[in-house]
Structure formats: structure tokens, C-alpha cells
Amino acid sequence: MTTNAAYKPRRFKLHIRRLSFSRFMLYLLLATLVVIAGLPLFAMVCRSLMPLDELYIYPPRLIVHKPTLRNFSDLLTSLSSSTVPFTRYIFNSLFTTVVTVLISVVVCCMGAYGLVKHKPAGSGPIFAVVLAALMFSTHVTQIPNYLVVNKLRLVNSYWALIIPKIAVAYNFFLVKQFCEQLPDSILEAARIDGAKEYYIFWKIAMPLLKPAWTTLAVFSFVNNWNDYFSPLIFISSNALKTLPLALQTLSGGAGVVARSGAVGAATFLTTVPSILVFAIMRGKVMETMSFSGIKS
């Protein structure tokens, strides 16, 4: 009895020590990943605040010693006197992104709800086409998209950046999976009470689908805000360029050395909206990713 009594506390201490060591290694790994992921963002913030004499100092500095907002001032004032002001690029990105997100949410939710709850003729083949579309990269469909947009005479317009991204297969599939969890008993009860279909969709289905369409909105915002390839293909006018193309314009050409601080500020302004949107909506995104279905 004495031997067993002495052995159990010792084994318990070894277990606690082993558990503490494994947890320490886990935290160490997570901290390393945070540093690796956060270091580029930290360098970007410092570079946007660095005066010109610190940007080209040798050896290079990661941490800014004399922070200044001069780079942002030059970006929004000095460059605004050029042919296309930088604020125009911000407006182009904001307008095309917001319009795309709003239309995409409505179209994908309506399409998925109608396909799942009303089951029209050919709903099976339609869903099969959506699944097949998930297998292709967006770059594969750029040439067909360009041919369609060119046929509609929408090249070099805002609609060229909006229409091809309205009905994305992944967004449709995401909402469709949530629509399958909508309890039919609630919808039937509303119909028995005399509710019209548009009322059922907007007042009952959409609130229940909020985790799905908020996640759709976040993904759509981030993808469209950071999209470089589509504006490069569809847009040739400087007045219609978005922020990713504006960064390319600022980073090259004559006087690029003098604009280095402004380029850092432009990079900061381009990156921050995506981070803020995801940080604000991360709760809904995590809820959707965990697929917390609606119980009847």
C-alpha cells in the first residue's frame, strides 16, 4: 500500500510535467507562427511611417525611429495633383467591391434558396454544374469571361469588374449547404399563415442564413478588394484602375525613389480594409466554418 501510494503521486507529477511541456511547445509553435505572419505587416506599417532618409539608410532598419505622416500627406495631396488622383483609385476599388458584394449576396442567396426549397426542374444538373465549376481556377475562366464582357461591350467599365464575380460557384455552394439546414416546418407555417414567398425569403430565410451570407460577404470583399488580375485584363483607362493596379503604377516609372514613402503608405491603405473587415466579422466566419446547422 505504501509503495502504491508513493507511486501514484510520482506518476501524477510526471503527467503534469509532460502536459506542461507539451503545452509549452504548442505555445512556442503558435508564437513562432504569429511572428512569421505578423512580421511583414509590422514592416509594412513601419515603412509607411518612415521618412525618406530612413528608407534608404544602410544597414536597413526594420523599426522606424522618426515616424511621420508625411508619406500619407504626399500620397493624398501631391499625387492628387496628377492626372488621376489617388483618391480616385480608392473610390474605384470601394465602389466595385461594395456593389459586387451586395449583388453577390442577393443573387447567391436567392439562387440557393430557390434551388433547395423549391426544387425546380433541372435542379440536379444545375447543382452538378456548380460542383464542376468548383474544380476550375478563376484564371481558367478569364478568357471566356473576357469574351462575354467584350460581346456585351462592357470592357473598360465598372461592370466588367462586377458582373463576372456576382455568381461565384463557391459562394453559391456555401449558401446552398446552409439552405439545406433551414427547417421546412417554419417555412410551411409561414405559408399557412398566408405569407408570400418574398416575405418568407426576406423575413425568415435571410435572418436564418445570416452566418452564411455574412461569410460570403467577407470572402467576396477580400477577394475583390485584393484582385489584381481582373482589372489588369478588363481595364485600360487610368481613371478606372483599382488600388492593386495603382500600386503597380506608383512602384514604377520615373521618380520612383522619391515616391517610396508614398508607395509604403499606399500599401498600408490597400491592406488595412481587408484586415479590418475580417477582424470585425471573424465571429460569423468561424461560426460558418464550424457549420453550426439550424435545428428544427
Residue ranges and their predicted role:
Residues T2-S296:
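A hydrophobic, multi-pass inner-membrane permease signature
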